Amino acid sequence: MQRSKAFFLNGGTGRLLCAIPALEKYLEESGDENFIIVCEGGTDVFKGHPTLDKRVYDNWHKDLFRDKLVNMDVISLEPYRVWEYYNQKCSIAQAFDIEINNKGIRPLPKPTLRLSKDELLSGRQLVNEVKEKIKKDKVVVFQPFGRGIEHIDGSFVDRSNRSFEFRDIKNIIRRLQDKNYAVILMSEFGVDFKEANLKDELAMPENVGIRVWAAIIKYADHFLGCDSLGQHLAYCVDSKSTVVTGSTFPINVSYPDCKHVNILDMGELEREYSPIRIAVDERLDRKHEGIMSMNDDIIKVVIETVTGKK
């Protein structure tokens, strides 16, 4: 008798979101009626999912091993170790699908993210409050930092080279404000802009959960960000977005075929694949240092893309 599977998911929330289409396909195609999903980094993205929510467990769930896992095949998912992924043949969502369903590269639907009325209202209310307070008609959500960002001795360091440079962040915010946009900064920590000479107040919401962030992005006029969670949320809620990539490949981490996603690839000419979760390659980290640094012309393109002038 074939045992049911327990799929273990780890990593950031963006990875968890990207696993959803493959898990939906597994439910449709496998005949495994009792499979479960075990999340090592939280279950928020699955809340309210019409078919997967009831199958999802935190890894600290009481008696999970005794009641479930002991009679199941445990599968640890790692899309970065899929050949098609590290050879730039597929997206992370497709890599999950190859791992889980073994059907090769195929089109997948966007992840199902069901937001509650309360979450939607919270997001809409925050956007409207920002518009009213800053006296602007349009709002951009800006996520400049990737998951690897660190704040060291007053400076921002991202060894994965996915985040915007701080000087460019300030310049972009200034120019968006000059175009009469209010800016909501999406960040896991507070950032000091006192010396940035910004024309308008910068909205920096605190203690906002990822589901409310999805709603904020939904009701904003545009999302601007790097290779991080926000771009995946924007894709899920069909928001117009501009995604700036550096050390990572758009085909792997973003949505180059989506009409409402604009990608500015800073690393197109110089980048090599960094084998994250496979091997440690300090040479590539050093090579990619500064890959996200922008000159004035590039910042102009970013602003034109966000404001719809390009």
Predicted regions and their residues:
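Active-site and donor-binding regions of nucleotide-sugar-utilizing enzymes
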Residues: M1-A93, A215, Q231-H232
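Structural motif
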Residues: S4-A6, V139, H222
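Structural beta-sheet core signal
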Residues: F7, I36-I37, F142, L185, ...
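Donor-binding and catalytic core of enzymes assembling or modifying cell-surface/extracellular glycoconjugates
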Residues: L17, V157-I251
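Generic beta-sheet signal
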Residues: V38, D58, L77, M186, ...
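Active-site regions of enzymes building and remodeling cell-envelope glycoconjugates
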Residues: H49-H61, D67-V74, E195-N207, D257-M266
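Active-site donor-nucleotide binding/catalytic segment of nucleotide-sugar enzymes
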Residues: E78-N87, S122-K194, S247, D257
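Leloir-type glycosyltransferase catalytic cores
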Residues: R81-E129, D257-K310
